[in-house]
Amino acid sequence: MTHMHITSWVIALILVFVAYGLYSSGNSKGAKITHMILRLFYIIVIITGAQLFLKFTAWNGEYIAKALLGLITIGFMEMLLIRRKNGKAATGIWIGFIVVLLLTVVLGLRLPLGFKVF
């Protein structure tokens, strides 16, 4: 399940950048299709993350923080695309997205189901 979760959020990250680029280039039809596929991957990421979260019986604060950071990351992904679609500035959203994404990945790798990088 861990590999499915990681694969789904990596694909979701790729789709965010593709959709952002399509919105930036003015290709609204392609961007809309990519955005809808990305929303499907949001659901897959949330479901696989919930399964990993519920796998343990003894939770601590790190598991809850990882789950919340994951949901916030998905929120930032969606805000980035909506702001780009509407032509609004997204600099602050980009900074928040990168910070929260890095925190989420580092915390995910630190937990027992993550890869032993740290």
Swiss-Prot record:
Q: Where are the transmembrane segments?
A: 6-26, 33-53, 62-82, 89-109
The alphabetized UniProt keywords are: Cell membrane, Membrane, Transmembrane, Transmembrane helix
For this UniProt entry, what is the primary localization, expressed as one broad class? Answer: membrane
Q: Does the keyword Cytoplasm apply?
A: no
Cross-referenced InterPro entries, in alphabetical order?
A: UPF0344 (IPR010899)
Membrane topology term reads: Multi-pass membrane protein
Pfam families from the entry? DUF1516
Its Gene Ontology cellular component terms are: plasma membrane
Compartment(s) where it occurs, according to its Swiss-Prot or TrEMBL record? Cell membrane
Report if keyword tRNA-binding is assigned.
no
> What's the family?
Belongs to the UPF0344 family.
Q: What is this protein called?
A: UPF0344 protein BLi01172/BL01343
Q: Which organism is it from?
A: Bacillus licheniformis (strain ATCC 14580 / DSM 13 / JCM 2505 / CCUG 7422 / NBRC 12200 / NCIMB 9375 / NCTC 10341 / NRRL NRS-1264 / Gibson 46)
